[in-house]
Every structure is written in C-alpha cells, then in structure tokens.
Amino acid sequence: VAVYTHLGAEDLARLIAKYDAGRLVSAKGIAEGVSNSNWLIETTQARYILTMYERRIELADLPFFLALLDHLSEAGCPVPRTIHDRSGAPFRMVGEKAAALIEFLPGVSPTTPDPDQARAVGSALAQIHLAAGSFAMSRPNDLGPQQTSAILHECGADALASIDPNLPRILDVATGIARNWPNDLPLSIIHSDLFPDNVLMLGDRVTGMIDFYFACTGAMAYDLAVTHAAWCFDRSGMHLNQALGAALVEGYDSVRPLNKSERDHLPLLAQGACLRFIASRAQDWLDTPADALVRRKDPMDFVHRLEFYRDKGQSAFS
C-alpha cells in the first residue's frame, strides 16, 4: 500500500460523511507497497482503512473484489468486510478515482514468522479456498505465466539489465514455464498475493487476510505455492526455511488436503509464482515515479527463489 494521491482533511471528512461511520477524527497516510493510496482512518465510531485505487486495478473489477471480501467475511473467514455508503454502494468516486472504506482488523504482520504462524496461515488460506467455492463471481488471472512472460519480454532485455545485469536471463526461463503450465488442477478464487504484510496476526492466530486486489479464479495449489515463495525464504531469496515451508503446507493440508497432481506440480507452480513477482517488480521498478512515497522492490529476490525451486524440485516442499 502506498500514497500516490494526496487528499486534504476537508476532502477526507467530506468523503467519510457519505458513510454511516461517524465523523472523521484523524487520517494517516500509509507508505508501503506500490499499487494503491491508503489511509488509516479514525472516526468517532471506529477505525477503518480507506483505499484509493491507483494502478493495475480496473474499475470494472472493483465489484468483484469488494463482494469477495463480504462473501468471505460472512463465511467466517478472517477477512475485512467492505463498508457500504449510505446509498448501499461499496465504493465511491473521488474525481476520476475509486475509493473504498474497509473494516479495520486488529493484529500485526509478522516480520519473522515462525512455524506455528506459518501453519495457521496455511489453514486460513485453505479455509478461504473452500469458502470461495460458493462465491458466484469469477475473474480471470491476468498475471498468469503467459501474461507475466509477455510483460517481461515487453520490458526487454536492455531495460531489465538496467535493474540488474543478471535479470535478462529470466526471459528464456519465463517462456519455458508458460509452455509447461498445468491447466487441469482444482480451481477456486485465490488470493495470489499472500505476503506476510497481507496477513495480520495476534500471536499464532490469523486475525486478518487483506489486500485481495489480485484475487482471481485459479489453481488453489498455485496460491499455496505463491504463499510458500512469499513466506519461507530469507530476504535475499537464497535460503529456504524448511521448517516454515513444511508447517505452511501441513496447515493447508489439515483443512484441504492436496491431491497427488497438485503436490507433484508444486515446484513448477512455485516457479510460476516467482515469475509473477519478478515481472511485477520489474515493471514497477521501471514505471514508479521518482517522487512517489514508495519503496521499490528488487526483482532479483524472486529470481533467486525461482532458481531454488528449479534446482531443488519436490525437496523444497518436503
């Protein structure tokens, strides 16, 4: 999450007044991530997160994302609900940009997760996959291996080399992953971006899973592979915490056991997960305005992960 758009106190107060959410007391911009502008809102009634959609998120997709939050919340998943305005609308337009008010959930994102926390996250992810099975809407994955391979090739070898001289080597790898991608694994709505900073915890209990703005219809095992890649390595992406990875998969299996095909495909799915983050990070690195209040993230961290999964295969998950 990040702050691209700057709204004054009067603008924010006017917006909050459209909701039955109390009067604005304070608003604090949150400066992390790259896709939206976010504020922590405190009113006379409660705390909320206000999100303004800046990049990647199409207006036509917002009803899907926000209805999904409501569906999962109503199913008992640790997911924040959308706060609808006085007219019942799940989002409002502020100028040419859409903004939504989201329930604030307690908890903190784990910076150095332990196996008990990873196990709880695996269980919560499986719970979401099962609950999403009855969600009436669908959305294609626009960041699957075919698309992310295309993004990297559109960036081009020269631009990728300007980020890191070793990055262009990923182009041939991307083509191979896209060519071998499985299309017959069990599907549901998946989160597809479940990094530790998108999970809130109190101790080893998951209190919130947030930022569903890459959610789509996809292979459930791919979502587990995304989470494995996001949670179980050190910052460099060179060293896997095997105990963390085993606990994550055990937690998932305890709620929704993987079938043999899903388990066999985990190494390739994880490489595809890494490819997705390499592509989005490279694109963000090249496109992010110099004066934006954001941190640029190094795509090489996920090149190292991808190479690990390619070298270790199934042993990365045992």
Kindly give the residue locations of the regions a language model identified.
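Conserved NTP-binding catalytic cores of kinases and kinase-like/nucleotidyltransferase enzymes
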Residues: V1-R86, L202-R205, S315-F317
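An alpha-helical support segment within catalytic cores of ATP-dependent transferases
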Residues: L7-Y19, A136-S138, I151-S192, L202
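Active-site acidic catalytic loop and adjacent metal/ATP-binding pocket
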Residues: A31-T44, I49-L50, T82, T175-Y222, ...
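ATP-binding pocket architecture of kinase catalytic cores
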Residues: T43-M137
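A cross-family kinase active-site recognition segment
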Residues: T111-P165, L185-L187, T217, L293-R296
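ATP/Mg2+ or Mg2+-diphosphate-binding catalytic cores
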Residues: D142, Q146, E154, D158, ...
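Active-site activation/catalytic loop segments of kinase-like enzymes and analogous catalytic loops
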Residues: A221-P257, Q271-P289
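All-alpha amphipathic helical-bundle segments outside canonical DNA-binding/catalytic cores
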Residues: L258-A270
